[in-house]
Amino acid sequence: MMALPADLPKKMAPHLLVQLRPMLEDDLATVVATEQAAYGHPWTLGNFRDALKAGYAAYRLDAGEQLVGYLVAMKVIDEVHLLNITVAPAFQRQGWAACLMQALSLWAKAQGAVCLWLEVRESNERALKLYKVFGFQQVGLRKDYYPASRTARESAVVMSKPLHT
């Protein structure tokens, strides 16, 4: 199980139950709809199903009955690779991505990981800023990693963060 950090976003109504729980197959319709609303090049239902089938860590963050966001991560030996982190558009810019990142770091440490890895679109300035705040540093660039349009590609910034116990 993944724990929530103590400092949840202050804008959240105090009467709502906020919980982070494992993502299930039954959640995928809502998750995919959120993914499509959040991104121009979203993960597909098949991507999420494959992640669940592979046993990746997949968690959803709920406030009351609403899906706030989710993350999917893969543990390999002593490293954790963040594959997807998304906050629903209605909840963006309220501190929920930071909450998910803190939860991921806590979970990764509990799994014995010594570092976190991720890729992010070179144009995703908000995400790059968030990751830098959380101690990630650029360690590489993957040219033409992401689709940008039918004819263009976009590079991925590869980032890593050591986890200190």
Provide a role label for each language-model segment.
Residues 21, 119-121:
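Surface-exposed loop and edge beta-strand positions of immunoglobulin-like domains
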Residues 3-94, 98-107, 111, 144, ...:
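Acetyl-CoA-dependent GNAT
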Residues 3, 117-119, 132, 137-154:
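Conserved catalytic-core motifs of GNAT/GCN5-like acyltransferases
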Residues 101, 124-127, 144-150:
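Short glycine/proline-centered loop/turn elements that form peptide/ligand docking sites
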Residues 87, 121-122:
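Short amphipathic helical patch at the helix-1/turn junction of helix-turn-helix
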Residues 91, 96, 130-132, 153-157:
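ABC family nucleotide-binding domain
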Residues 41, 114, 152:
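Flexible coil/turn residues that form the inter-helical turn or adjacent wing/linker of helix-turn-helix
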